[in-house]
Amino acid sequence: MTKRKINVLDYSSEILKALSKGILLTVKGDEKVNSMVISWGHLGMEWNKPIFITYVRENRYTKAILDKTLDFTINIPLDKMDTKTFSICGTKSGRDIDKIKEANLTLIDSEIVSSPAVKELPITLECKVLYKQKQVLDNLPDDIVKRDYPQDVDGTAVGSNRDPHTAYYGEIVAAYIIEEWIKGCCKLIYWNESKK
């Protein structure tokens, strides 16, 4: 499997645009892999390191794995995520189903972290957690708490619920494009081709 290394900051605009539409956060623990759709996150520099910050609610299955492994991958589509993948990974729990199998995703061994890359979402950021912080709802404006953390919605509900997020600051230890997927795709798209 050919992986073309990229400078993540050269692709920041494309990564953040994809994030707003939904990308995958993938974790692996005890031989179980789970992916979830995320649309909240940050890409930048902190502690003189490239960092991706992701947010995971307290009751999510992904959080239980992430707290043990302390690494993750961010998997980004070249265009938009397949609707089946988006539906399965965005509305189902890995406690109940094998989302990788249900969404027909192909896992690729990562270069450094234990969590795998996903062939069908070929832009990959491998991240090691350097810091994590649980959000304090009392410190947020009331309108945000009401909209994003409705206290009358159980923490097991998909979407907005009463559980706060934990912010995970992941040092990006590897970043690349899985090229085999691009070559086999019916629609050859290279993001930021001039930066090769």
Q: What is the predicted function of each stretch?
A:
Residues M1-K196:
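Basic, polyanion-binding surface patches
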